[in-house]
């Protein structure tokens, strides 16, 4: 776990936006935890990448 942040979905101007914006509170994860959990992404040992979400799966801005 870690700190929590609020994300909002941004879509292409060509897409129709819903009446209610999609947003979710997600957890910011330690980068090394994310890197270990997702070796298929071949993340570098150090990065300025933000890793956020729930390792077990859950809501994100694409959740319907």
Curated annotation (Swiss-Prot):
Tissue: Expressed by the vanom gland.
GO molecular function: serine-type peptidase activity; toxin activity
Localization terms from the record: Secreted
Record has Secreted as a keyword: yes
Annotated S-S bridges: 5-23, 34-51
InterPro entries in UniProt: Peptidase_S1_PA, Peptidase_S1_PA_chymotrypsin
One CC-aspect GO term: extracellular region
The enzyme's E.C. designation: 3.4.21.-
Primary site of residence: secreted
Domain of life, per lineage: Eukaryota
Coiled coil feature spans: none
GO biological process: proteolysis
Keywords: Disulfide bond, Fibrinogenolytic toxin, Hemostasis impairing toxin, Hydrolase, Protease, Secreted, Serine protease, Toxin
Subunit structure, interactors included: Monomer.
Family affiliation: Belongs to the peptidase S1 family.
Function: Thrombin-like snake venom serine protease.
Protein name in UniProt: Thrombin-like enzyme collinein-4
Organism name: Crotalus durissus collilineatus
């Amino acid at each position: 776990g870690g700190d929590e942040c609020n994300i909002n979905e941004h879509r292409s101007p060509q897409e129709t936006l819903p009446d209610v914006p999609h947003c979710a509170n997600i957890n910011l994860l330690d980068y090394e935890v994310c890197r270990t959990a997702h070796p298929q992404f071949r993340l570098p040992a150090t990065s300025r990448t933000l890793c956020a979400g729930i390792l077990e799966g859950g809501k994100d801005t694409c959740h319907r």
